[in-house]
A protein has these predicted regions:
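Hydrophobic/aromatic-rich transmembrane helices and adjacent perimembrane loops
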Residues: 114, 203, 319-350
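Transmembrane-helix motifs of polytopic, lipid-linked glycan transferases
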Residues: 31-34, 111-132, 140, 171
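Specific aromatic-rich, kink-prone transmembrane helix
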Residues: 151, 164-183, 189-191, 333-340
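Transmembrane-helix signature of polytopic, membrane-embedded enzymes
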Residues: 124-148, 166-167, 182-186, 248, ...
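Extracytoplasmic
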Residues: 87, 242, 361, 365-500
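Membrane-interface alpha helices of multi-pass inner-membrane proteins
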Residues: 175, 184-212, 229-234, 309-315
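Extracytosolic helix-loop segments that constitute the early lumenal/periplasmic catalytic or substrate-binding loops
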Residues: 59-83, 90
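Loop-to-helix entry region of an early transmembrane alpha helix in multi-pass inner-membrane enzymes
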Residues: 89, 93, 101-122
């Protein structure tokens, strides 16, 4: 009897120890969640009013909105006056009232993204809480997403389409989970909004449609009909308004981009595994254990959400021009699925020591995402370097072509020209639609239309070196959406030889 009592007391003591450890681990995880949320919004506020671009294509988003406000079509034949970004237009339409209310500046459009991110975090919480009814694990999802600010290129607050597109994607997923007729239609509508903001999100939704087909064919047919009807109608309207250029810019030209095959490996070895290896291991382990039950529950949606976002992020990262922002959809799915499967593991094992292991792994996962939140914040020195660059060109007579900039040329009274990325995309493409623009561009170089051209030192541009020469004059400044990277931008001037004939 004494031996049995001593064993029982030892077991109680052991469980008590594990309970105290688990409380401590939970406390530390809450601290990291608070730190993640504080740091991301501290950066947002610190960058919101910065008057220059935080990322080299931010200004182009404003130029698109201004063009719409002037009553002009954004999907037009390419020219030195304007070349559109290769995105569907909903983000620009959303930006119009913000520009009207807050003025023509970066603040107005960054505010769109920041508000979108607040809603994105809220929806992330709601998706996990709907599934687990557990506040702690719902906050874990929010913390993981907030901490992913660094791994996705400090992108959430930029005046770019991504945060809003991802918000629509997640809202669609949230309503899809209910398997309710009315909410099913809301899901289809928000899925269309994601497509109409960034067309590549159709790939994510196709996987979710497969889950709906498996679970409820009646809901699937209505969802499918509404979703693709909205896509078809919007595509027809935009194509008619643009005389067919909507199709070219959003589908034909992106399809012509080449692939960066080295990223087949680096997507995993550099972009994901150093930061999310614990999450991916736990998620794979759970779905392997539950493989026989997946098709019997709503968990099939989470598996297909993971696969769909992985496909989307992987495909775009391999594509020419795919930066770290393309990881956001997959990072959102990891942030949501990890706390849900850890919660499920707790239910499956119902053991304090297993819970300790799981909480420890989650804590380590958070630690892998810690970053220096001062890195992406522009300093006075950064601001001064950009102003020094602009002031140099303010004094230059005639047109200057700042190829890595849009909108900021207005600050120095200079005309805006298409961004380098857009010009280069066209010139390297084997498409007949570029021919008129290429002739115009060659003629502008040949006749020395530009008094000076500014181009990143590590970039090349077809035809440029035939009519302009690279000088020793350069500007050097920090990039705010990449860790410890600087841009060296070199001035090109017209060659003396007369090409006018």
């Amino acid at each position: 009897v004494k031996k049995i009592k001593s064993k029982l007391n030892a077991k109680k003591f052991s469980e008590g120890n594990f309970l105290n450890i688990n409380k401590l681990l939970t406390f530390f995880i809450y601290l990291l969640i608070a730190y993640a949320i504080f740091s991301v919004f501290f950066v947002f506020i610190s960058r919101l009013f910065f008057p220059y671009q935080l990322e080299w294509m931010e200004g182009g988003e404003i130029e698109h909105i201004l063009r719409l406000l002037d009553g002009k079509c954004i999907y037009c034949p390419p020219s030195l006056e304007f070349i559109p970004y290769i995105y569907t237009p909903l983000f620009y339409y959303i930006g119009i009232p913000f520009i009207k209310i807050f003025g023509v500046n970066f603040f107005s459009i960054r505010l769109v993204s920041i508000l979108g991110f607040v809603l994105l975090l809220s929806t992330t919480y709601l998706v996990v809480f709907k599934t687990t009814k557990n506040k702690f694990w719902s906050f874990v999802a929010v913390g993981l997403l907030a901490f992913s600010y660094s791994t996705t290129g400090f992108w959430f607050d930029l005046a770019r389409v991504d945060t809003i597109a991802n918000l629509f994607m997640l809202l669609s997923f949230f309503f899809l989970l209910d398997e309710n007729p009315k909410r099913n239609l809301l899901s289809a509508f928000f899925a269309f909004c994601a497509f109409y903001t960034k067309q590549s999100f159709i790939s994510v939704h196709l996987f979710l449609l497969l889950g709906l087909l498996i679970r409820d064919k009646g809901l699937f047919s209505k969802h499918f009909l509404l979703y693709f009807s909205l896509i078809l109608v919007s595509t027809i309207i935009e194509t008619i308004r643009s005389n067919g250029w909507y199709i070219f810019w959003n589908f034909t030209l992106p399809a012509s981009h080449y692939w960066i095959w080295s990223r087949v490996v680096t997507f995993w070895s550099i972009d994901l595994l150093p930061f999310y290896s614990i999450s991916l291991a736990l998620i794979l382990g759970y779905f392997f254990v539950q493989k026989d039950e997946l098709f019997k529950s709503k968990e099939i949606y989470f598996l297909l959400f993971l696969i769909g976002t992985l496909f989307n992020s992987y495909f775009l990262r391999l594509h020419y021009g795919g930066y770290l922002n393309v990881l956001i959809p997959f990072v959102i799915s990891i942030s949501i699925v990890l706390p849900i499967i850890v919660f499920r593991f707790q239910q499956m094992f119902n053991s304090k020591n297993i819970q300790t292991i799981l909480l420890t792994l989650v804590l380590v996962q958070f630690c892998l995402l810690i970053y220096d939140f001062l890195t992406p914040i522009p300093t006075q020195k950064d601001k001064g370097e950009i102003e020094y660059l602009l002031n140099n060109f303010r004094e230059t007579q005639g047109d200057v072509y700042l190829m890595g900039y849009n909108f900021v040329q207005r600050y120095i009274g200079k005309r805006d020209f298409p961004h380098y990325v857009l010009v280069n995309d066209l010139l390297i493409a084997n498409l007949k639609e570029k021919e008129s623009f290429e002739r115009e561009f060659i003629y502008s170089l040949k006749t020395h239309k530009f008094s000076a051209i500014l181009l990143d030192d590590d970039l090349t541009l077809k035809h440029l070196d035939k009519y302009y020469y690279k000088t020793d004059k350069f500007f050097y400044h920090r990039v705010f959406n990449t860790k410890n990277v600087f841009r060296k931008e070199v001035v090109w001037l017209p060659k003396q030889k007369d090409y006018s004939n």
